[in-house]
Amino acid sequence: MNTPRPEPAVLDLEARAHSEHARELRLWLRLLACSQLIEKRVRAGLREHFDTTLPRFDLMAQLERHPEGLKMKELSHRLMVTGGNVTGITDQLVAEGLVERVAVDGDRRAFRVRLTPAGQTSFAAMAEQHEQWIVEAFADLPARDVDQLHRLLGRLKQSQIEINRRLQADELE
């Protein structure tokens, strides 16, 4: 019986740790490997089906959540990328008629970026397919395992938030 071989990039990622390493390190590398495998399929799907990229999808997702639009600095912060990256992506989406820049009242230099009607339609189609790809990524796991992973990762996330708060408080002292 042939066991499917992991993709080389994932094999390399998990090969960084061995049984003598802390189980937390092995878990971290496993989480990264899973994330990279899913993201790889999503990136390929966005490129193949919508001729777009994950960063463009992510920017449009932020704008979809904020119909009034977001300032460039807010977009940069939410996407955790530089202002230059946001400007480049926004320029492309403006040229394609998917987003627009709208002047902010009372501030001649500031603009909000928001989806156009065409952008809303385009993003809705992408978001529907994106959700399906994510559902498919977990299709081999029973629902109870997905629920358990969700709970456990929620606990991990909360733990990390608390650790970050403590670290920031220590830095202020």
Task: Show where each model-derived region lies.
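Charged, amphipathic alpha-helical coiled-coil/dimerization segments
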Residues: N2-A15, D91-R151
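Active-site phosphate/pyrophosphate-handling residues
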Residues: R26, D58, D147
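Exposed, interaction-prone assembly regions rather than primary DNA-binding/catalytic cores
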Residues: D147-E173
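Short amphipathic alpha-helical segments with heptad-repeat character
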Residues: W28, L32, Q36, M80, ...
